[in-house]
Amino acid sequence: GHVMQTATGSARTFEARDSAADTLARLRGMDADALWVVYHDYAGLGRAKAVPRGRFEEVAREGVTFAMANWDLAITDEQVPHPIFGADSGDFRAVPDPSTLVALPHRPGVAQAFSRLTDDTGAAWVGDPRARLVAQVVRLDALGVAVKVAFEAEFVVVQGTDPEALHSDLGRMFAVEGLDGRWSMGARILDDLDAVGVAVHQFAKEYGPGQFEISLLPADPLRAADHFLLARQLIRAAARAEGATASFMPKPFADVAGNGLHVHLGLTRADDPNVDLVADRDDASALAETAGPAIAGLLAHAAGQSALASPTANSYKRLLPGSWAPAHVSWAIGNRAALIRVPGRGAGRHLEVRGGDAGMNPYLHLTGLLAAVADGVEKHLAVPPPAEVDV
């Protein structure tokens, strides 16, 4: 357990010893009537079972049971071709992770937790996306690299179910009117995220009709992915409360701006968070030594990574040349058409990965990104020259 303890606080999740007692204590403190135990499948869909107060003790310890065959379901709930898990493949358990327990602001009396996944025997299950992410955090830690992650998500809000209603929305990019027209929803989102401990950087009207963007503050990778999924859930609920629908679909309408999910990666020295591994300490316009191999690793694995970052057919309707979304594998210092962008100067400098959308499972996307960074650092990969034109 020592390595995990030192690599990241969130890795303690996967040390099951004290988690049941911790879960129970927190549930009692919340005075919850029901607990929603949630895991996210490979399509990034939250799946859950609700348990009543009388079963809290048992579920805190044992978790809830799901059929392994659930992993074969696509985002449409159709079984994928050539499924890995048959009807005879048994069960897995979702055990509440106490560090993720929240009281749902829009559902009084309901507590919710994300999960550690185990097999029938209670041993950690190899297919758990959260555990796979923690393993890459530990790998980078051994290379002397610590990572902070911030998600930036776009979504569209449609009133009722009429897509034509979208086009009557006149709020322009960052327009005050756009923000004002939806402020009861915006205020609800900010209040609810604050209540569950998700730290927001900013919320704004985006380019497309009915389109908004929310940026979250940096956190360790596991926490950042947890927070994005919680934010997505609460944003959808806030829109529903206003009689509207919030959609994170990559390209919901052909002629309207698509929705991206950008990932910002900050790299520091594992033993000294004050040493930035992206920005050069002495030259604000230069990159630090580790940034080159990190970017090279991200580019080397970009094609494979797209299966994790933008996993739906709809994703590729967004990723077109000339669309401000990355259609090619490239990197640049400021260019917003590049796949890997290096925004910021000095201490604020970091890596922004622009290819993804909310059809992803963010744990798997981050697992792939961190593995690519680790590969670049381990192999001392050389970074190609930056692209400075709109690609």
Regions found by a protein language model. Name each.
Residues 225-233, 238-249, 257-268:
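Loop-centered beta-sheet repeat module
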Residues 5-13, 18-25, 230, 244-245, ...:
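Catalytic-core signal marking the mid-to-C-terminal active-site face
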Residues 113-119, 212-218, 265:
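Short, hydrophobic beta-strand segments
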Residues 178-182, 186-189, 194-200, 214-221, ...:
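Accessory "access/gating" subregions that flank catalytic or transport cores
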Residues 148-159, 166, 196-216, 246-262, ...:
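Core alpha/beta catalytic barrel or barrel-like domain that forms the active/cofactor pocket
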Residues 41-43, 118-124, 178, 218-224, ...:
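A generic structural motif
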